[in-house]
Amino acid sequence: MKANKPAPNHVIFKKISRDKSVTIYLGKRDYIDHVERVEPVDGVVLVDPELVKGKRVYVSLTCAFRYGQEDIDVMGLSFRRDLYFSQVQVFPPVGASGATTRLQESLIKKLGANTYPFLLTFPDYLPCSVMLQPAPQDVGKSCGVDFEIKAFATHSTDVEEDKIPKKSSVRLLIRKVQHAPRDMGPQPRAEASWQFFMSDKPLRLAVSLSKEIYYHGEPIPVTVAVTNSTEKTVKKIKVLVEQVTNVVLYSSDYYIKTVAAEEAQEKVPPNSSLTKTLTLVPLLANNRERRGIALDGKIKHEDTNLASSTIIKEGIDKTVMGILVSYQIKVKLTVSGLLGELTSSEVATEVPFRLMHPQPEDPDTAKESFQDENFVFEEFARQNLKDAGEYKEEKTDQEAAMDE
């Protein structure tokens, strides 16, 4: 008789307040924006009834946009803008209890009677988590969009930031991410031609990709066809992957960064042609110390990548999206001049494409892992980044003891 295959372990992320009054549990750190809908943040809060006696416990979701270093104050101008804030009271429960998710039901069963569920939703107009990579020598916070979940206990009905006791609160970063749509667009292709002085016929360039969407880490084959009907020599063919980042909220900053490049060894003499495929792989690993590269929002420095292409729901105002990211292939040809190297000219054309994550597993399949309550609890890691100043918390007694 064939043994049943055990259900896979499901990692549950948890974080506890310094005074041990509040512990928050989340089933994941990344929440998927499907364009038409966004996965809600469903989790639970475990409270110590003695420590929260007479208090209220809240959970909040904040989306914030930062532009540059917040420690630089110019005429009172704030370099942070909250794009969205939502808050729910979880203890004591208010109103009729809503439906719980399968994850919440399993956690309540495992953690006991002092566990309270919460559900926070994203509106459809919010940007995804993204940040511009600071240079190694930069200090302070860099430009980016991030999402923060906070759970806290307080006596006060006024839950302003400066009135929340830090020892009774926990803060953690999550990410809102997009994955590639299931339907591909048309195969990207571009053609261009140039007429040169003293040449009757043009130089033609055709560039094509095998598909519209590539996944992070996937090789991108670029087919280049050069038809040189001129009297000049095409001395160099260079293919680039360019990341185009547009900061649209506070300004109209526009960054174009090359994140991968390849060069053909062949030249194309007058009245000849060449077709060649060059393969490029844009990776963060090759761009880690370059300032201004857009990244998917960071939770831990080792688990991020180049920012995914932005997909905007129809009808949404682009200016509230914070940072827009797109990608293009650029092919540059260097053409000889009358005086050789001194008068060489460059011509180029671009082909847009999308760089994204593949679709995750079927949600119904993922839910099966909850049925046996096979949870593995993992402490929610604090940011290990130079730009983590705002999220840096005082150490717990246990952490302090470990440092001694």
Curated annotation (Swiss-Prot):
It holds the Pfam family Arrestin_N. It comes from the Eukaryota. Keywords: Acetylation, Cell projection, Membrane, Phosphoprotein. Belongs to the arrestin family. The keyword Acetylation applies. Coiled coil: none annotated. This is S-arrestin. GO terms for biological process: G protein-coupled receptor internalization; response to light stimulus; signal transduction. Detected in retina, in rod photoreceptor cells (at protein level). Monomer. Homodimer. Homotetramer. Self-association is cooperative. Isoform A and isoform B interact with RHO (via phosphorylated C-terminus). GO terms for molecular function: G protein-coupled receptor binding; identical protein binding; opsin binding; phosphoprotein binding. Binds to photoactivated, phosphorylated RHO and terminates RHO signaling via G-proteins by competing with G-proteins for the same binding site on RHO. May play a role in preventing light-dependent degeneration of retinal photoreceptor cells. The modification N-acetylmethionine is found at residue 1. The modification Phosphothreonine is found at residue 230. One of its GO terms (cellular component) is membrane. The C-terminus of isoform A interferes with binding to non-phosphorylated RHO. Interaction with phosphorylated RHO triggers displacement of the C-terminus and leads to a conformation change that mediates high-affinity RHO binding. Isoform B is C-terminally truncated and is therefore already in the optimal conformation for RHO binding. Transmembrane segments: none annotated.
